[in-house]
Each structure stands twice: as structure tokens, then as C-alpha cells.
Design a protein with these regions (language model features):
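N-terminal metal-binding scaffold of metallo-dependent hydrolase/deaminase domains
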Residues: 1-43
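C-terminal cap of metal-dependent C-N hydrolases
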Residues: 9, 311-314, 364-424
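Divalent metal-coordination and catalytic microenvironments
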Residues: 9, 22, 27, 54, ...
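Active-site metal-binding motif and surrounding structural segment of the metallo-beta-lactamase
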Residues: 38-58
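Metal-associated gating/positioning segment near the N- to mid-region
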Residues: 53-117
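Alpha-helix-loop-beta-strand connector modules within alpha/beta enzyme cores
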Residues: 58, 107-124, 171-182, 324, ...
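Histidine/acidic residue-rich metal-binding segments in metalloenzymes
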Residues: 140-296
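His/Asp/Glu-enriched, well-ordered alpha-helical/loop segment
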Residues: 196-198, 202-219, 289-290, 294-296, ...
Length: 424
């Protein structure tokens, strides 16, 4: 069913929330408010009347930093399981990083991945291509070829861009109008220690300082991944004031947790960059509020059951996040008054859509990528709730509020929380 009449709910559009209905016909949004109500009365075709019961209706979320693990690491996640986790979390578009096996570094690999996506994805998937072949940092990829395939974002995620090839990569990505994402981690500064001591903030902000010089020189669009340190925020603030083409993201775990929340050294708190101090966390929240940080990105990095009992030493980095992102931020920030609901929704829809170059707002005539959010329901996070193969979440055992109840992609129902079965 691609015809829907969503009524008795609040709608987030034009960056405000107000009570109105939404009419979707043929997978397109055709009317809001009184116009939607009147058109529904005149429509004689098959349609699903959905009583939102006071819930919030928003454009589907967009994640610019996901790890779907396929091909090569299907024991951790697959396109099918990862995108099912996405729609369960309210995401209708995800951008998977290229740290797969093989890496997404050639058009042949891209074509194979595109086929897998067509056959298995539950939502829209916009792959991120590698910056260098094999993500080895020595030889750049065919940026023009990838751009012709519709790729916008380029990254060697997990591996910082080597000094010897950095300028060539910035020039190449800039020439095709792409966006370069670098993993900010100066490995020369990585040491030994526990929690955040092992990967100091200097490893992040000093590499960003280098990259910003290349942005000044090349004018390449640049996106700062998973900001974690207050010093990094200061550099981004100055770069934006200077007019550099820079955007930035922050993860839900860095917005809501610090190293002090780690009560025992379990592997599901192991992440890059690490959880830092309360000063850092507050700086990140303030930066998201002010627009210095543009978007929330999940950095969803499932590792399957092999990580669950792991200690920090030897445990792989990354946490499962697609299904807890909205819930954790709504619970820990919105309900506590440190972030507005409108700003949270903006950072998950309009802002990432602008970076990716896709429509991400509820408007007449656009494809109906929609999520309906129950802001009242709360549940304790357990392993059994996850659609993802990974349950390595720092929110296990926490009570979170704000759950997607329905997710539509092009008007097709891809997720219903209460167990209703809809057909497209």
C-alpha cells in the first residue's frame, strides 16, 4: 500500500511542529492539513487510514555514517539486517562506509554492491566510496567514475588519510563536487592506557588542523566525522566563521555518555573516538544546538556476539546504534531540556539531506520517506529488541523513551513497531 492518510498527529515540517494530517498517494506526499482532509474525502481508491493517536510524523532520518559490513563481514551485519535495524530506528536512508572486504574502491565492487542493495535493502542506501585503493592510503580511486555512479561521499573510514596522498585526494574529490570525510586519528599520538587516555584528543584535532589547510587550498567540501573533543569544536567554529565548506557530525553516544559512565570494562563501550570528559560532552551538545555541528550520525558499527563479553584489550571498536539513536537523544537530551525536539529532527533529516544532496523534508510532491514516532512509549533496552546482528550497545539496560511506530520508504511500509503487517 503506497496510499496513506496519516491523521490525528503532529507533523514536523518547515522546521516547526504542528497538528495536521498528511495525505500520501502513489508514494508521493500530495497534501497537508485541511487540504489533505478534503482530498481524502474525495479519494475513492484503496488507502490506509492511519490514526497517529497524537504521535509525531517526520521525514525519515538519514544517516551519513553507517557500517553494514557487507561484503566480507556478514557475520557482523548484512545489508538486510542492517537496513532492518535502520527502519526500526526511523532511518529511511543510510550511507555505509567502505571498510568492507573488498573495500568499495572500484566500479566493479560498486556494481556488485548495488546489486546486493537492490535485492536485500529495506531502505535507501547511498554507499560511501573509498578515497584510496584498498583504503591503503597510497593510490587514489576513480573519483569521476564513482561520481558518475551517483556517489557523493568519499572516505577511508577507520584509517586516516596519509600525508603523502592527502592533497591529491582533496583535489580529486573537489573536482567532482564530492564530499571528503577523513577519519581523524593521528596514529603517531596513539598510546597505551585506559578508555580515552589511549586515543587523546590531540590525535583528532591536530589532524583536523592539517585537513583544514587543505580545504583552504583546494576548497573541497569536507565533512568532519564523529567529533568527540571540545578542541575540535573550536576548530570547526573558526573554519565556519572563515567561510570554509565544512560540515560536521556527532554520534549519540558522544552526546549522552562520558568515560565516567563506563562502570566495568565491557567491550560495548569500546569505540573510536573514545568517550571523553563531561566538558567535551557539553561542548558537543552546545555545538549541535548552535549549528556548529550540523548533524547527528550513528556510526553504527555492529560486531556480533564475539564482542559482547570482550574487555577493552583486544575487543573490536564500535557500537550498535541505528536503533537507539533517536531514543537515546530524545530521552537524555530533549526530555532533559538541553536540546529541542525541532533541532534533533533537523539534525537527522534536513541537515544530512543537504550534505548528501537529497530532499529530506516533508513537502508536497516529494517521495514519502516518513517515520511516525511514539514519544510516550518507553522500554528497557535489551539484546532481544535489536534487529541488528550486533547487540554491542552502551545503552543495554537503560530505559529509553521515543519509539518509531511506523516507517515508510517511498510510501511502502517497511517497519511497524506494534507488529501490524502492511503490504506495499
Amino acid at each position: 500500500m503506497v496510499n496513506w492518510y496519516l491523521h490525528n498527529g503532529s507533523v514536523y515540517r518547515n522546521q516547526i511542529i504542528k497538528q495536521e494530517s498528511v495525505l500520501i498517494l502513489g508514494g508521493l506526499i500530495v497534501a497537508f492539513g485541511e487540504a489533505a482532509d478534503e482530498a481524502r474525502q474525495l479519494f475513492r481508491g484503496p488507502i490506509r487510514d492511519f490514526d497517529a493517536g497524537g504521535q509525531l510524523i517526520s521525514a525519515g532520518f538519514i544517516d551519513l555514517h553507517t557500517h553494514l559490513r557487507e561484503p566480507g563481514f556478514e557475520n557482523k551485519e548484512t545489508i538486510a539486517s542492517g537496513t532492518m535495524a535502520a527502519v526500526a530506528g526511523g532511518f529511511t536512508t543510510v550511507c555505509p562506509m567502505p571498510n568492507t572486504n573488498p573495500a568499495l574502491d572500484s566500479l566493479e565492487v560498486f556494481d556488485d554492491l548495488a546489486k546486493r542493495i537492490r535485492n536485500n535493502a529495506h531502505c535507501k542506501v547511498q554507499p560511501i566510496a573509498a578515497l584510496t585503493q584498498g583504503r591503503q592510503g597510497t593510490k587514489t580511486v576513480d573519483y569521476k567514475g564513482f561520481k558518475a555512479r551517483g556517489v557523493v561521499l568519499f572516505s577511508d573510514d577507520g584509517d586516516p588519510l596519509d600525508e603523502n596522498v592527502a592533497e591529491e585526494a582533496f583535489v580529486g574529490v573537489g573536482e567532482v563536487g564530492g564530499v571528503l570525510i577523513n577519519h581523524l586519528e593521528d596514529k603517531a599520538l596513539i598510546g597505551k592506557g585506559f578508555f580515552y587516555e589511549q586515543i587523546p584528543p590531540e590525535s583528532e584535532y591536530l589532524m583536523l588542523r592539517r585537513d583544514l589547510e587543505l580545504v583552504r587550498k583546494t576548497r573541497c567540501r569536507y565533512h568532519v566525522a564523529h567529533v568527540s573533543a571540545w578542541q575540535t569544536v573550536e576548530l570547526i567554529t573558526k573554519a565556519k566563521a572563515e567561510g570554509l565548506p565544512v560540515t560536521a557530525e556527532v554520534t549519540p553516544h558522544h552526546l549522552t555518555l562520558t568515560y565516567e559512565d563506563i562502570k566495568e570494562p565491557r567491550g560495548h563501550f569500546q569505540m573510536k573516538p573514545p568517550l571523553r570528559t563531561e566538558k567535551d560532552r557539553r561542548a558537543l551538545v552546545e555545538a549541535l544546538n548552535s549549528g556548529v555541528i550540523d548533524i547527528v550520525a550513528t556510526d553504527h558499527a555492529p560486531h556480533g556476539t564475539e564482542k559482547e563479553q570482550g574487555l577493552f584489550d583486544g575487543s573490536p571498536f564500535g557500537v550498535t546504534a541505528l536503533e537507539t539513536t533517536f531514543r537515546s537523544l530524545y530521552t537524555e537530551l530533549v526530555l532533559k531540556g538541553t536540546l529541542s525536539l525541532e533541532r534533533l529532527l533537523y539534525s537527522l533529516t534536513i541537515a544530512p539531506g543537504a550534505i548528501l544532496g537529497v530532499e529530506a523534508e516533508l513537502k508536497v510532491g516529494v517521495r514519502a520517506d516518513v517515520v511516525v514516532l511514539d514519544l510516550i512509549q518507553e522500554k528497557v533496552i535489551t539484546k532481544e529488541l535489536f534487529q541488528s546482528k550486533g547487540t554491542n550497545s552502551p545503552f543495554i539496560g537503560r530505559t529509553l523513551q521515543g519509539w518509531p511506530s511506523l516507517t515508510l520508504v517511498d510510501g511502502c511500509p517497511v517497519y511497524a513497531h506494534a507488529g501490524e503487517v502492511y503490504t506495499c
